[in-house]
Amino acid sequence: MNRLKEIFQKEITPALVSKF
């Protein structure tokens, strides 16, 4: 579960941030 959180913060968060 921790790895999923890591991937989320590393991959998905930057993708969301670059959208805005």
Swiss-Prot record:
Keywords in alphabetical order: Ribonucleoprotein, Ribosomal protein, RNA-binding, rRNA-binding, tRNA-binding
Cellular component GO terms held in the UniProt record: ribonucleoprotein complex; ribosome
GO molecular function, one term: rRNA binding
Superkingdom of the organism of origin: Bacteria
Physiological role: This is one of the proteins that bind and probably mediate the attachment of the 5S RNA into the large ribosomal subunit, where it forms part of the central protuberance. In the 70S ribosome it contacts protein S13 of the 30S subunit (bridge B1b), connecting the two subunits; this bridge is implicated in subunit movement. Contacts the P site tRNA; the 5S rRNA and some of its associated proteins might help stabilize positioning of ribosome-bound tRNAs.
Miscellaneous comment: Under acid-stress, this protein is expressed at a higher level in wild-type B.cereus than in the acid-sensitive mutant strain NB1.
Self-association state and partner proteins as the record states: Part of the 50S ribosomal subunit; part of the 5S rRNA/L5/L18/L25 subcomplex. Contacts the 5S rRNA and the P site tRNA. Forms a bridge to the 30S subunit in the 70S ribosome.
Protein family: Belongs to the universal ribosomal protein uL5 family.
Name the UniProt record assigns to this protein: Large ribosomal subunit protein uL5
Species of the source: Bacillus cereus
